[in-house]
């Protein structure tokens, strides 16, 4: 069995980072006065000395994501406007191969440059409709996009695993 914290990404992110269940009729992320009062795992980690960053290859202003991520404790929010990358894009933003390569490079760079622990969260988007990915493995666009994201996450983990820092890393994958 698989369980999801919500049926929408904005609600799933709040469940993941603040422990607040996804609401069926509204998104607390869009209600800044309420969202600002929620606890945040990134804030707890920041207070313990972690550098915190949220990376998304799309527009972080969509559904008020940027404001929520800052309010729950991320020190830095990187989205498509701050990446200056080239490559395949869907209507939502950069494809997962581009974003995960960027994120892996940034994580490795930060770990090597700083003497502090790092907490990075990355939101993928290639498995979102309209399921347009630079990849042709399966017949249906939906399953093909899942296979693409799966392969890119594998590449991301392998890139991190190839570093000396791997022994001190923990990679957690969660659905929204």
Q: Model-derived features: where do they sit?
A:
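Solvent-exposed soluble domains appended to multi-pass membrane proteins
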Residues: 1-176
């Amino acid at each position: 069995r698989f369980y999801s914290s919500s049926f929408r990404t904005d609600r799933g992110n709040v469940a993941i980072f603040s422990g607040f269940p996804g609401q069926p009729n509204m998104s607390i992320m869009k209600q800044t006065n309420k969202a600002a009062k929620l606890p945040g795992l990134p804030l707890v980690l920041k207070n313990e000395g972690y550098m915190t960053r949220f990376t998304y290859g799309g527009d972080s202003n969509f559904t008020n994501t940027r404001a929520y991520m800052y309010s729950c404790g991320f020190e830095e929010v990187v989205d498509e406007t701050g990446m200056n990358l080239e490559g395949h894009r869907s209507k939502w933003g950069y494809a997962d191969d581009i974003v995960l390569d960027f994120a892996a490079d940034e994580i490795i760079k930060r770990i090597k440059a700083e003497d502090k622990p790092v907490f990075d969260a990355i939101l993928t988007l290639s498995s979102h409709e309209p399921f347009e990915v630079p990849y042709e493995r399966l017949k249906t666009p939906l399953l093909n996009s899942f296979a693409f994201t799966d392969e890119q996450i594998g590449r991301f983990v392998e890139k991190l695993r190839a570093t000396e820092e791997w022994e001190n890393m923990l990679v957690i994958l969660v659905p929204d």
